[in-house]
Regions:
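Karyopherin-beta/Importin-beta family HEAT-repeat alpha-solenoid scaffold
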Residues: 3-5, 150, 159-160
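Short beta-strand His + acidic residue motifs that chelate non-heme Fe in jelly-roll/DSBH
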Residues: 90-93, 158-165
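Non-heme Fe(II)/2-oxoglutarate
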Residues: 1-72, 80, 89
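Catalytic core of non-heme Fe(II) oxygenases with the double-stranded beta-helix
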Residues: 82-151, 169
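A short hydrophobic beta-strand segment most commonly corresponding to one strand
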Residues: 101-103, 167-181
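Short coil/turn motifs at secondary-structure junctions
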Residues: 107-109, 159, 178-181
Length: 181
């Protein structure tokens, strides 16, 4: 088989964060979660350790994105909690006003990303695909567990996946980060 050179890429960082007080964060979500204005009055000192993790890992992501070792002036623009799968996160969407987004999972959950290169798949027929990979898939679903964090380009279409089989309460805290001046 020929070696395919991957020329363009969409990076998503996935990792597990330890040493955060998840019980305290869950309680905060239950007290502050409001639809539809989830980010209003959500920020709190309780979130400081998590915000530090968002910024540290976001810095690593942006350095790789920009191809630099220099620190980038990154700041959290919005932060909010999610519980269950409401309409605002259960349909494909992106975060247009930010550079990168991050989600920290307080319970298990699924996050699905849509391939931004759909047009390139127009003649790649599903019946011809033997094994799905990053070259031929329409979507990529990440199975998250408590403590997992994902960071991604905010323009990437994504949604919180609910398949109807899970009866647990899905909880996460998300943020949008921008490049400061």
């Amino acid at each position: 088989m020929n070696k395919i050179k991957r020329m363009f890429s969409v990076g998503v960082s996935l990792f597990n964060i330890q040493n955060l007080n998840n019980d305290e964060l869950k309680t905060h979500i239950l007290k502050k979660y409001k639809i539809p204005a989830k980010h209003e009055n959500f920020d709190s000192d309780i979130l400081n350790d998590l915000k530090g993790a968002f910024l540290t890992e976001g810095q690593n992501y942006v350095k790789e994105l920009f191809g630099t070792e220099k620190d980038v002036n990154l700041k959290i623009d919005k932060i909010w909690g999610n519980t269950h799968v409401d309409q605002s996160i259960g349909i494909p969407h992106n975060h247009r006003s930010s550079l990168i987004s991050a989600v920290y999972y307080l319970t298990k959950g699924k996050l699905t990303f849509l391939n931004p290169y759909q047009l390139l798949l127009s003649h790649v027929h599903k019946e011809d695909i033997v094994s799905y990979n990053e070259l031929n898939c329409d979507i990529w679903t990440c199975d998250m567990v408590e403590g997992d964090m994902v960071i991604f380009n905010s323009a990437l279409q994504h949604y919180a996946h609910f398949d109807g089989n899970e009866k647990h309460e899905r909880m996460s805290i998300a943020c949008d980060m921008i490049k400061g001046k």
